[in-house]
Amino acid sequence: MTSIFQRALGPDFGQLHPQLQRRFGFSAADGVACVGRGTMDRVWHGRIFTRPFLALGARRHILITGSGRDIPFTIENYAYRDGFGRETVTFARTFWFDTAQHWDATMIYSAERSAIVDYLGTHQHLAVDLHMTADEQGGLLIRSGEQRFSECGIGLAVPRLITAVAEVRESYDDDLDQFRIEVVVTNRVFGPLFGYRGTFTATYSELTQVPAWVRPVKETARA
């Protein structure tokens, strides 16, 4: 079965580095778990007035509030079919500050939107379109687009003025034999909100059951 990222990228998926093709190329039918472990060279957040915004998101694992250097990091990717039968991939990120902080997401591919839809947090309140391209070096570039807030079956587009725009680049360093990741999240009013960069290695194992804690508490059908 084709992965959601193969559907999103189409023929350009073949331009990715082979290690990225492996990491983003499995589906629920493959029964594979991918767990990345590494270190973020730097995790940062914006000016002090952004912290209440970050703290609000952190309550539902949508954002993180910690900062520092050489922060241990894990990312857990499991492919499964959700309660609506949609091919879904988890992105469960843990940053090990003095205490663990989580930034979690589940992703699907929406043919209607011609994009990956990234459901952020524990209750899928926030749905974000992700637009992906492969760069000339075989890296994966991701930029967030339209955002929608959903609660009690009602979906509302988030005004661009208050949206957080994420830019992500993931690549593979053949010299280090590791993945590189850099994420920057900004707001057009408040400026940079937070970001991180670092490296990690990925291990692949047979998946018998998706851990309950990486699945959202609540699923939403609205893409």
Report the location of each language-model feature.
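Exposed beta-sheet edge/beta-hairpin loop segments within beta-rich domains
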Residues: 186-192
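HotDog/MaoC-like acyl-thioester-processing domains
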Residues: 215-222
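Amphipathic alpha-helical hairpins
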Residues: 186, 222-223
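Soluble ligand-binding/transfer domains with enclosed cavities or grooves
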Residues: 2-185, 196, 208, 212-215
